[in-house]
């Protein structure tokens, strides 16, 4: 199998995410803020710490960024001149009504009543909460975070019963 053929099998299109919207937008490094998002090593991250070093005799002040990958939880760091632009991911969060679990995927219902079947069942504590709510027959919503063509379930919240 050729490398080109292999690549073709791994190409995915994510038209449904936000067709026409850019996955990232540029922002000057000095304008980034703790709690905001940034792309480091081609991964969407949330900034957990940042510090600025003074301008040295050879140029610009540098900004040291410490961030957590919003999908894997891995810590990433970057150092950039304060005047340079960094990419900021467009991060979107949508709540879907939970329907059921189908093997390793969540079956969710969007606001139009359409089924969404492409969100993987999360791992760890969140998976336990989803399974418990499902067992108890509760109505609940799953928060799905989307950025740079990836998406993942990030939290759950019980529906408020208005009787």
Curated annotation (Swiss-Prot):
<dbReference type="InterPro" id="IPR020189">
    <property type="entry name" value="Transl_elong_IF5A_C"/>
</dbReference>
<keyword id="KW-0694">RNA-binding</keyword>
<comment type="function">
    <text>Translation factor that promotes translation elongation and termination, particularly upon ribosome stalling at specific amino acid sequence contexts. Binds between the exit (E) and peptidyl (P) site of the ribosome and promotes rescue of stalled ribosome: specifically required for efficient translation of polyproline-containing peptides as well as other motifs that stall the ribosome. Acts as a ribosome quality control (RQC) cofactor by joining the RQC complex to facilitate peptidyl transfer during CAT tailing step.</text>
</comment>
<feature type="modified residue" description="Hypusine">
    <location>
        <position position="57"/>
    </location>
</feature>
<dbReference type="GO" id="GO:0043022">
    <property type="term" value="F:ribosome binding"/>
</dbReference>
<keyword id="KW-0251">Elongation factor</keyword>
<dbReference type="InterPro" id="IPR014722">
    <property type="entry name" value="Rib_uL2_dom2"/>
</dbReference>
<dbReference type="GO" id="GO:0045905">
    <property type="term" value="P:positive regulation of translational termination"/>
</dbReference>
<dbReference type="InterPro" id="IPR048670">
    <property type="entry name" value="IF5A-like_N"/>
</dbReference>
<dbReference type="GO" id="GO:0003746">
    <property type="term" value="F:translation elongation factor activity"/>
</dbReference>
<protein>
    <recommendedName>
        <fullName>Eukaryotic translation initiation factor 5A</fullName>
    </recommendedName>
</protein>
<keyword id="KW-0963">Cytoplasm</keyword>
<dbReference type="Pfam" id="PF01287">
    <property type="entry name" value="eIF-5a"/>
</dbReference>
<dbReference type="InterPro" id="IPR012340">
    <property type="entry name" value="NA-bd_OB-fold"/>
</dbReference>
<keyword id="KW-0648">Protein biosynthesis</keyword>
<keyword id="KW-0385">Hypusine</keyword>
<dbReference type="Pfam" id="PF21485">
    <property type="entry name" value="IF5A-like_N"/>
</dbReference>
<dbReference type="InterPro" id="IPR008991">
    <property type="entry name" value="Translation_prot_SH3-like_sf"/>
</dbReference>
<dbReference type="InterPro" id="IPR019769">
    <property type="entry name" value="Trans_elong_IF5A_hypusine_site"/>
</dbReference>
<dbReference type="InterPro" id="IPR001884">
    <property type="entry name" value="IF5A-like"/>
</dbReference>
<dbReference type="GO" id="GO:0005737">
    <property type="term" value="C:cytoplasm"/>
</dbReference>
<dbReference type="GO" id="GO:0003723">
    <property type="term" value="F:RNA binding"/>
</dbReference>
<dbReference type="GO" id="GO:0045901">
    <property type="term" value="P:positive regulation of translational elongation"/>
</dbReference>
<comment type="similarity">
    <text>Belongs to the eIF-5A family.</text>
</comment>
<dbReference type="GO" id="GO:0006414">
    <property type="term" value="P:translational elongation"/>
</dbReference>
């Amino acid at each position: 199998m050729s490398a080109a053929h292999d690549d073709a099998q791994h190409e995915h299109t994510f038209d449904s995410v936000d067709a026409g919207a850019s996955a990232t937008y540029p922002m000057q490094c000095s304008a980034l803020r703790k709690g905001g998002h940034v792309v480091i090593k081609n991964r969407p991250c949330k900034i957990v710490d940042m510090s600025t070093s003074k301008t040295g005799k050879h140029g610009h002040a540098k900004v040291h960024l410490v961030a957590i990958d919003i999908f894997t939880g891995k810590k990433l760091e970057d150092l950039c001149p304060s005047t340079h632009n960094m990419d900021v991911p467009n991060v979107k969060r949508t709540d879907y009504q939970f329907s059921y679990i189908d093997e390793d995927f969540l079956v969710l219902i969007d606001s139009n009543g359409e089924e969404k079947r492409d969100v993987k069942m999360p791992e760890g504590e969140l998976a336990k909460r989803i399974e418990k709510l499902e067992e108890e027959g509760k109505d609940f919503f799953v928060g799905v975070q989307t950025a740079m063509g990836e998406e993942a379930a990030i939290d759950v919240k019980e529906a408020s019963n208005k009787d």
